[in-house]
Amino acid sequence: MKIIAMITARSTSSRFPRKHLALLGGKPMIQNIIENLRLLKHIDEIVLATTTKDTDNDLVELCMSEGISIFRGSEDDLTLRHGGVLVMCNPDIVIPISGDCPFMDIDGCQAVIDAAIAHPDYDGYSIQSPYARCPEMMIAAHRRSWFTKAFQVYEEDPTVCGADQYNVAVNLNPDRFSKYVVDGTDIIDRTVTSMKFSIDWRLEMEFFNAVIEGMGYYPHHITDFIKAFTDMRNIGFTWRDKGAS
């Protein structure tokens, strides 16, 4: 069985161009994502799925220096880009990672991978808790069958979304996909407040850099943020964007 992690990233975000190369905790954000994935067991290959545009050359060079595989394809059609990764790597299971999600709860993510290995008769795998939702810190896992069905449901009605968001078509057709859901009750602490952990804006990058500086280390668990936010509140932490006037 071959398991890959597929990082989808490009440098032409209108909200925060080249954000994957911006420093988070003293390292490029994409490097933190790669290091997170290397903490997980059973991942055989990490792949960057990016575009053929010259604007992504720096991103590709950094990822190559980290020793991960590269696939370059369409900027706007993720069915083609992700399909190209499937052809190149021939995986049994894919862990899709968004390039703007630099934080992972390692225990929760590992539980999803372990479930995908232990329960092979499903298209997709995820984790849920009756308490807080922190989707950007968790992962999903998809078998090849998930992508086959996902591309098909998008092709059946491409008007529901753009090809860069074909997952919308998947969400509109949940009955077409079999799914195993890991019980995250004992993994996701009930005291966690639901919040956004992805980085789409410079302001968010500045905020999380301040949090990491306050912690003194890079977080790998949701509980790290609980402690950090509690400590920052107790010392009367105040912060504003450095670019604010």
Question: Over which residues does each language-model region extend?
Answer:
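A structural signal for isolated positions on well-ordered beta-strands in alpha/beta enzyme cores
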Residues: 4-6, 45-47, 180
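Short beta-strand/turn micro-motifs composed of small residues
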Residues: 9, 50-52
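N-terminal nucleotide-binding beta1-loop-alpha1 segment
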Residues: 1-17
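Short, conserved phosphate/pyrophosphate- and ester-handling motifs at nucleotide-, phospho-/glycolipid
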Residues: 201
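Short phosphate-binding loop-to-helix
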Residues: 52-117
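A short, N-terminal amphipathic alpha-helix
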Residues: 29-46, 59-61, 65-66
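Conserved core of the sugar-phosphate nucleotidyltransferase
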Residues: 104-195, 206, 210, 226-245
